[in-house]
Amino acid sequence: MYVAVKGGEKAIRAAHALQEQKRRGDGRLPELSVEQIGDQLSLAVDRVMTEGGIADRELAALALKQASGDNVEAIFLLRAYRTTLPRLAVSEPINTAEMRLERRISAVYKDIPGGQLLGPTYDYTHRLLDFTLLANGEAPSVQQANGEAEPTPHVFSLLTQQGLAKTEEDRGTPPDDITRTPPVYPCSRSSRLQQLMRGDEGYLLALAYSTQRGYGRNHPFAGEIRSGYVQVEIVPEELGFSVNIGELLLTECEMVNGFVAPQEEPPHFTRGYGLTFGMSERKAMAMALVDRALQAPDYDEEIAGPAQDEEFVLAHADNVEAAGFVSHLKLPHYVGFQAELALLKRLQRENERG
């Protein structure tokens, strides 16, 4: 048994060396730097930060490089590193209404206070391969407009002021922290949003799509999608007042959903909310759609689709947990298989005897 274990260790070390060689690729080619990944593969970095739970572009780019571009493996690496970090402070709530905008669009109103800003996007492109990139084509220069920034209140706040939507209420209870306390179903809204933010983008996208195909009552409009930089502040105990410690690039999505007519309230629109690091717009939209679907019990709506089942959605959203459980099937299961094999052969013998 000892010889078998030592042999396994040698095989594992050799496998890791081979993987490292494969990750590096052809040595005649220049190595891809972490800075290049962070700057030129920014959307992949945004996803790893969002689902890995650390807003650090350098660490996310490093994880992507180490994982050979495997997003889920990079997210796993970032989550593992996160467990080693001390918690030095808790930030004040960020104010996305004061975001320094990179992009802002609304599908419900053409003219909104502060205007719409198309910003960087793949929308409206023809999805044709750009072969000039094979020749290291340079990006076109962009002229920056110098204009005075106008206030950009949330579109949903305009609806609430007109009595068309219900204002979100802060009940004063501290938000849950799913990194310290395991979720318990049914979840609080804060716990649900945290799990959705860390959830797998593809999984949430599929569930969001299902709500549009009839598996759950959900008729949404993109009330507002905004991306930009927000200030992060903390209140040090020794000072007693807030101090700006930096800024974060975030994407926020508020979906205007079908109206409800409660008995004790006037009819009003409902909302779904999504928030991600970076420019992860598709993830923010999917998150907002699923968030609204999970509010079905709050509005006494019939559970008509998987996206409305809170425990089903949230318990299977984490790609690190999912990948870990599926991957464990690669480990030796010799004893378990031999037991089933013996049982199958016994049943076959009994069947032959009639």
Task: Indicate where each model-derived feature is located.
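Acidic, serine/proline-rich low-complexity intrinsically disordered regions
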Residues: 143-354
